[in-house]
A protein has these predicted regions:
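Flexible, low-hydrophobicity surface segments
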Residues: 1-171, 192-195, 277
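Gly/Pro-rich active-site capping loops and adjacent beta-alpha segments
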Residues: 6-16, 133-155, 175, 232, ...
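General beta-strand structural signal in soluble alpha/beta enzymes
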Residues: 34, 78-82, 118, 193-195, ...
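Flexible hinge/switch segments at interdomain interfaces of large molecular machines
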Residues: 39-48, 207-210, 352-365
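Alpha-helical support elements that line or immediately flank enzyme active sites
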Residues: 52-86, 123-144, 211-278, 332-346, ...
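Short Pro/Gly-enriched beta-strand edge/turn motifs at strand-loop
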Residues: 96-98, 187-202, 284-291, 333
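Conserved catalytic cysteine-centered active-site region
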Residues: 113-115, 244-252, 276-287, 291-294
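Helix-loop-helix junctions that connect adjacent transmembrane helices in secondary transporters/permeases
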Residues: 159-241, 384, 392
Length: 421
């Protein structure tokens, strides 16, 4: 089939203020000269250095935690465990979780008091006069675990008898889409194509690790300057610190890379707790190793696409199953899963659709927002499936790939989620 491109008619644009003109970024000068202040650049007088003690096993019960040697080390201002916290659950009340209600078993803990669920779970906080002293104090913390079986594969985590990461069944979120009649749609197809795809964990590796400072001002307000993408977390942080919201002020600094990884609470709560306990300014900056161990990743997905297609390359039906690996805690998994579900069929008209998606807790690092927020998982698969269908149809009908591509083009239509494309 021959296709000749037609020239587009000339378009006269109105005079625009920005489009088509050079724009000077307001932050360009500071970044080019190195004068921009990031969270890790802030040092305060009389400041303590904070460190976090993390779990070294993926799943187990804390049998004994002894921080007495760390507390006795000269230069250590305080050591905090879950026993000293007013409440240890960092509530993440996310809509979209199973039953549309928060499942407490999937909430993250500020500090693990009895159970650890992944390598990197925070157990204790240390504040000391110097960074070296704080690191030495971490080495003096003694912990004994009763190790439990761990589960890393979300499909295994769904099986009866699997290790329980999130009670009662490891499911932290479900979504579904129903449109038309799937059986009738498949019966209309000349060919049914089924494929299973996997999307792996992805690490952001942003240049700036998690960092911030906290202090108490003359009004008795806890101030936190932090590299964050969401300052609105102050409500949850105030709850964790057991102080009124008007006693907490969070100021975001320039973010040296976030990509969704700094949408969650990172070290804000740790800073607030250490500052309240010591009544002194505290600074925390993760090392690269700590950052990679402690922050979230992009969700791994297992996606099975089963689609029916006619010889004219019209999709008659689509059955899609998605399993997302939530890791140890829920965080933004319900929202990420929602967007992946809503875009599961891509930009194609499909009149008969069944989509089932589930996010599953495992003993992996927790997963959360990453650029695209679930949509890339669905999009990359949606663009792989047409290629699979074309290959199958070309083999059966002796069409070229180009011909089958043109046959699949359509004008404006309504997507299964009632959006107009």
């Amino acid at each position: 089939m021959k296709y000749t491109a037609k020239p587009l008619p000339p378009v006269t644009l109105p005079e625009l203020r920005q489009v088509g003109k050079p724009l000077r970024r307001v932050d360009a000068l500071g970044k080019c000269t190195g004068s921009t202040v990031y969270a890790g650049d802030i040092f305060l007088p009389n400041m303590l250095h904070g460190k976090v003690f993390h779990s070294s096993i993926p799943h187990g019960r804390i049998v004994r935690l002894d921080v007495s040697k760390a507390r006795a080390l000269p230069g250590v201002a305080c050591v905090i465990t879950a026993a000293e916290l007013p409440q240890s659950v960092l509530v993440t009340d996310m809509p979209g979780q199973t039953g549309q209600k928060r499942r407490a078993g999937s909430d993250a803990h500020i500090l693990a008091g009895t159970m650890v669920r992944f390598i990197g779970d925070p157990i204790s906080l240390v504040a000391a006069e110097t960074q070296a002293t704080a690191e030495q104090a971490l080495q003096l913390i003694e912990v004994e675990y009763e190790a439990f079986p761990a589960v890393y594969d979300p499909l295994e985590a769904l099986q009866p008898g699997a290790p329980v990461v999130s009670t009662p069944d490891n499911v932290v979120a479900r979504w579904k889409i129903r449109k038309g009649n799937l059986q009738e749609g498949m019966a209309q197809a000349d060919l049914v194509v089924e494929n299973t795809f996997t999307v792996p964990f992805v690490e952001r590796a942003y240049i700036e690790p998690e960092a911030g400072v906290a202090w108490i001002d003359e009004r008795n307000v806890v101030n936190i300057r932090i590299c964050t993408q969401v300052v609105e977390h102050f409500r949850s942080i105030a709850l964790a610190l057991n102080i009124p919201q008007n006693r907490l002020h969070i100021q975001g600094t320039m973010v040296g890379g976030g990509f969704g990884g700094k949408e969650d609470i990172t070290v804000e709560t740790f800073l607030g707790l250490l500052t309240l306990h010591t009544q002194r300014p505290v600074r925390i900056e993760y090392s690269r190793e700590e950052s990679i161990q402690a922050h979230s990743k992009r969700h791994p997905f297992i996606i099975t696409h089963r689609t029916g297609v006619t010889r004219e390359v019209r999709i008659t039906a689509a059955e899609i199953k998605m399993v997302a690996n939530s890791g140890a805690y829920v965080y933004l998994s319900p929202y990420v899963l929602l967007y992946a579900t809503a875009t599961a069929t891509g930009p194609y008209r499909v009149d008969n659709v069944r989509v089932d998606s589930v996010a599953v807790a495992t003993n992996n690092p927790f997963t959360s927002a990453f650029r695209g927020f679930g949509t890339p998982h669905a999009s990359c698969i949606c663009q792989a499936m047409p290629s699979c269908r074309r290959q199958a149809l070309c083999a059966r009908c002796c069409w070229s790939g180009l011909q089958s591509s043109w046959r699949s083009l359509r004008k404006t239509w309504i997507l299964p989620t009632a959006r107009c494309l």
